[in-house]
């Protein structure tokens, strides 16, 4: 399991969240990723390697592990438990460059499907893009953007104003869906996502090519 959170060298944080973020960023800290392993799904042992990116989603190809994280950055490691080395942005030279919030990954042969939402969209909603997994991973690029889900129901706050989303957390209901995760079982695919910004969790069955 890969987890992320604000990381420091052990210094004590300010108590209030807004002050803590300002304090951490001024010292070069950020939301980083670590792996944790478990044999029973209950008790986990945190691994020492720290990857300096957040919201990392990982898949294995050949002898390497690859991850895609916030903003669409792709990275590589020789082991899924090692520190990942940053590479290019999958979304470079696209309208989503630097705006990708969270991603979900599905591998189909030599193609990677990336489900994501983008900061600044009105409304923020889920898209799918395709990445052809050519031999040189520095050449991987996202293309072919398809809308998967957009807020349409009351539990997704579709009745609220249609405003561009912003980076960071949100503590009030808004017309946005975020944070996709794709789960496949017995030939069916479901996407789990947060609703009204970050006020709930929903799921929908989708067609995954």
Language model segments and positions:
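Carbohydrate-active catalytic/glycan-binding domains of CAZyme proteins
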Residues: 1-209
């Amino acid at each position: 399991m890969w987890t992320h959170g604000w990381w420091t060298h052990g210094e004590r944080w300010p108590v209030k969240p807004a002050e803590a973020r300002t304090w951490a960023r001024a010292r070069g800290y950020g939301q980083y990723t670590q792996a944790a392993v478990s044999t029973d799904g209950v008790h986990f042992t945190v691994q020492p390697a720290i990857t300096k990116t957040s919201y990392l989603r990982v898949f294995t190809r050949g002898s390497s592990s690859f991850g895609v994280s916030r903003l669409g950055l792709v990275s590589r490691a020789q082991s899924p438990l090692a520190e990942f080395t940053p590479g290019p942005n999958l979304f470079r030279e696209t309208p989503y460059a630097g705006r990708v919030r969270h991603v979900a990954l599905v591998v189909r042969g030599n193609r990677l499907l990336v489900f994501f939402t983008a900061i600044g969209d009105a409304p923020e909603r889920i898209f799918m893009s395709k990445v052809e997994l050519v031999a040189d991973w520095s050449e991987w690029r996202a293309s072919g953007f398809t809308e998967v889900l957009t807020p349409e129901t009351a539990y997704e706050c579709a009745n609220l104003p249609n405003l561009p989303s912003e980076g960071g957390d949100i503590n009030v209901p808004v017309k946005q869906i975020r944070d996709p995760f794709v789960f496949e079982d017995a030939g069916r695919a479901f996407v789990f996502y947060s609703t009204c910004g970050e006020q709930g969790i929903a799921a929908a069955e989708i067609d995954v090519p």
